[in-house]
């Protein structure tokens, strides 16, 4: 995806606007019998924008209001069950950024989000939006983060407009050397399928090791264990992911 925007300060008042374009592509699914099925009906482009206004009431305290809107256009007009999945949606929220000390900063907000689908058989997907982030830096070498997010995710379950996903993440970064960083992360989440009895719980534990060969070249190794517990028979999954990547930057 890509983002283009601008930010303007008027003394204590700040205005920020961004335009966003994102592309989501799903890989083919491999079935237990050895065959595979494609997920091309789930691929979509998203076009949208977000605007935020904020005002610095006190040093370290900046309340804000934010509004976002987007449209999602799928590669295929109908999904595998002949539902029209193109949609429009967005959110509105209010909150504040804060800095208690130089060691403890964060942001918290509450709002409302909704998504309407082209298919009249699908109900409007809506829900309470809560998001927060807290960053604690106990030492110059260690940073701890707590992050919670709410999102509306796509699904192909017949008659279900979408999935309301809430994630809660704890992450700790530690620099052993200037060139060696370790990252530990744990995530717990819930997925509620709207207009459906299905409900999932997500657990993920992850470890990363980042080796900074130079300012421009980083090598990253990752091991992750993902577990999904579902109240639907046969819907639970577990996976272990091992990745090795390279990051180039200027």
Report residues per predicted region.
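Transmembrane beta-strands of outer-membrane beta-barrel pores
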Residues: 8-12, 21-27, 69-75, 112-116, ...
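Solenoidal tandem-repeat scaffolds enriched in leucines and small polar residues
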Residues: 2-83
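Hydrophobic, lipid-facing positions within transmembrane beta-strands of outer-membrane proteins
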Residues: 1-4, 45-51, 67, 90-94, ...
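Extracellular loop and loop/strand-boundary signature of outer-membrane beta-barrel proteins
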Residues: 27-40, 76-83, 116-120, 154-158, ...
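Outer-membrane beta-barrel "beta-signal"
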Residues: 209-211, 216-218, 238-250
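Repeated loop/turn-to-beta-strand initiation elements of outer-membrane beta-barrel proteins
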Residues: 10-17, 59-65, 102-108, 140-146, ...
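Residue-level signature of outer-membrane beta-barrel architecture
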Residues: 4-8, 53-55, 98, 136, ...
């Amino acid at each position: 995806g890509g983002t283009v925007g601008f930010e303007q300060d008027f003394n204590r008042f700040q205005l920020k606007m961004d335009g966003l374009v994102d592309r989501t592509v799903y890989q083919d699914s491999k079935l237990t019998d050895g065959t595979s099925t494609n997920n091309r009906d789930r691929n979509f482009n998203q076009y949208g924008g977000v605007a935020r206004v904020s005002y610095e009431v006190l040093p370290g305290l900046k309340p804000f209001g934010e509004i976002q809107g987007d449209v999602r256009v799928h590669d295929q007009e109908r999904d595998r069950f002949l539902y029209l999945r193109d949609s429009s949606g967005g959110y509105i929220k209010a909150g504040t950024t804060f800095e208690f000390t130089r060691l403890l900063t964060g942001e918290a907000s509450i709002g409302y989000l909704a998504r309407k689908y082209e298919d009249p058989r699908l109900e409007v997907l809506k829900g309470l939006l809560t998001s927060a982030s807290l960053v604690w830096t106990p030492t110059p070498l260690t940073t701890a983060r707590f992050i919670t997010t709410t999102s509306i995710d796509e699904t192909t379950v017949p008659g279900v407009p979408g999935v309301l996903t809430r994630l809660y993440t704890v992450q700790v970064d530690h620099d052993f050397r200037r060139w060696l960083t370790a990252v530990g992360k744990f995530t717990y989440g819930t997925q509620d399928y709207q207009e459906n009895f299905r409900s999932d719980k997500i657990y993920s534990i992850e470890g990363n090791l980042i080796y900074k060969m130079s300012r421009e070249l980083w090598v990253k190794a990752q091991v992750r264990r993902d577990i999904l517990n579902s109240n639907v028979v046969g819907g639970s999954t577990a996976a272990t992911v091992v990745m090795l990547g390279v990051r180039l930057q200027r």
